[in-house]
């Protein structure tokens, strides 16, 4: 199966200079916990999650009013193209201990996101359980 068969499209993005308050508001309004961070040309330079905000800013007593996305984002973007196989997504999640992979078009711009839940639609229950366990046991923050 190809990524394009499972990808959640219409991905929202945010710029690295956006405020943390702006990100939090967007996440709350859209009921999402993950946003690709893009440069002025729309290409991904990182990702930010609600957990990144908590761990990298709030837990460290950071100034939330003045904080910017680039202070909390993960800079190493895991991405695939829509025409790639879902096995690559599963392998990326396992290798990097992540639960979401960005889907980018041929020009490198975000077009969607594949989550661990999306993998559940593809894999048999036993395999999903093993993949989820591996990802959750090894979840780490990387920059």
PLM features: residue spans?
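Short acidic/polar alpha-helix capping motifs at helix-coil junctions
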Residues: 1-3, 17-20, 32-36, 52-56
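A glycine-centered beta-loop-beta connector
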Residues: 27-30, 35-51, 93, 101-117
């Amino acid at each position: 199966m190809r990524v394009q068969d499972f990808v959640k499209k219409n991905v929202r993005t945010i710029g690295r200079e956006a405020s943390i308050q702006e990100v939090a508001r967007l996440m709350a309004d859209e009921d999402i916990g993950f946003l690709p961070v893009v440069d002025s040309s729309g290409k991904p330079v990182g990702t930010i999650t609600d957990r990144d905000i908590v761990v990298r800013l709030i837990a460290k007593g950071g100034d939330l009013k003045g904080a910017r996305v680039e202070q909390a984002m993960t800079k190493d973007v895991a991405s695939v193209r829509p025409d790639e196989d879902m096995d690559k997504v599963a392998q990326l999640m396992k290798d990097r201990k992540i639960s979401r992979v960005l889907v980018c078009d041929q020009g490198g711009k975000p077009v969607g996101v594949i989550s661990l839940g999306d993998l559940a639609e593809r894999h048999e229950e036993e395999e999903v359980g093993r993949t989820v366990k591996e990802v959750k046991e090894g979840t780490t923050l990387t920059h």
